[in-house]
Amino acid sequence: MDFNILTLGCKVNQYESQAMREDLLKNGYFLSENKDKADITVINTCTVTSVSDAKNRKLIHRVRRQNPDGIIVLTGCMPQAFPGEMKELKECDIILGNKERSKLVPAIEAFLAHRSRLVDIPGYLNRGDMYENLTVSSFGEHTRAFIKIEDGCNRFCSYCIIPYARGRVRSKPLSALKTELENVALGGYREVVLVGINLSAYGSGEDYDLADAVETACSIEGIERVRLGSIEPEQMDKELISRLAAQEKLCPQFHLSLQSGCDKTLKAMNRHYDTREYAEIVGNLRAAFPNSSMTTDVMVGFAGESEEDFQASMAFVKQIGFAKVHVFPYSLRKGTRAESLPGHVSPAEKERRAKLMGELADNSRKEFLQSQVGLIEEVLFERLRHGYLEGYTKNYTPVHVTGGDSSLCGEVRRVRLTAAAGDYCEGVLSD
C-alpha cells in the first residue's frame, strides 16, 4: 500500500513526520506517486493557535473529499489537546495521540485487519512519561537535518495550549542521540539542527543538559555545522553560554523567544523573565559569539495590552536589533488561562499593531543584512535556482551567488558578501 504524510506546524512535527515516513517504508509501505489518491494519508497536526486548528480541519475535509476511499490517520498536537472533540471526527479512520506515533504501523495493520475505526489518545502523566523512541536517518533532499532531542514543556505560559498537547519535559538520552547523529552523518548531512518543544530544558531532571547535546553533535565526524532551534531565554545562563561558545561547529544564530517587549505583558503571559534579563542574555550571547544573529517571535494584541504596553514592546524590539522577527497577533486559545483574562483587544486593533510591528521588523532585517555586507563568510550551498546558488552563512544569513553549478550544492565555500537585496545578501566566491 502507498502513503502520503501531510505535516503542519513546527520543526518538531517535521522531524516526527520523517520518523513515521521511515517507519512506514521500513515495514513495506511505499510513498505514493499520486499524493491526492494515496491508500493511506497521515495528517500530522499543529494546534498552537485556533488558526492552526482551522487549517487542520480544512485539510482533513479536503483529503476526504479528494480521496473518499482512502485511510486517513490523524495524529499530532490537535487530537492530544482535544481528545473528546477528535474522537467525534468521523472522517478520520485512525486517530493517534502524540505518545502513539511510534505505534503507527501496528495501528494501520489493526485497522486493515478489522476495518474498525481506531482511536488511541492516552493522556500524559504529571511526570514519569518516557521519551518516545523515534529516530531518523535522513531528511529527504535537504542539506540540513532536524533532530528532535526534547519533548514537552513545564512552563504553562498563559496563552499556550502546548503543555497539554505535549506533556512534561522529557529528553532523548545522549547515547541514543549520538547513534542517530552518526546515522545522519553517514547519510551525507553536514548540518544538523537540534530541536525540541522547550529545547533549552533538555536534560531537565537528568545528569546532562543542552551543552552536552551540543558537544555530542559537534563531536560527530562529518557534521560540520550544528544549530539550535527556538530557545527560552531565562535558561541561557552564563555557564551554558560559555560551554556552547567553546564548540566551533555551533552556529552563532539564536532564536530567542521574546513574545513581548513589555514587562507588564510578559508577566500576564506568565513568561519567566523580564526585558532587563532578556537584554542581558542577548548581550552575553553577542559577547560570546561575535557577529551572531538574534531572531525572535513577537506577539501583539495580547489580552490587556494597552497602547502604552504596545509602544514599550516596539521600543524594546528596536533596542535589541533583531536579525529577523516573526510578528503575529494574539489568538485566543480555548483551554488556556489567557482565555479568562480581561481586556481582549479587537481584531482590527491587533491587525494595526501587527502592521506597525511588522514594519519595524522589516527595518531591523534590512539593517542586519546591510551589516553583513563586506564580510567574507563560509556559506553552505543548498541549491541552484534561476542561475544562482543559494545557501546560508553560519549566522543564517541567506546568500545568493550568481553562476556556479550544482556540484557546489552541499559544499561549504568562502563568499564575500557584496550587497543586501530584499531578504538576502548577494555575494561572490572568494576562493
Residues covered by each model-derived region:
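Terminal RNA-binding accessory module
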Residues: S340-D431
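Short glycine-enriched, charge-decorated loop/helix-capping segments at active-site entrances
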Residues: T47-V48, R166-G167, K267-Y273, S340-V345
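Short flexible coil/turn linkers enriched for glycine and charged/polar residues
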Residues: G140-T143, C153-N154, L250, S260, ...
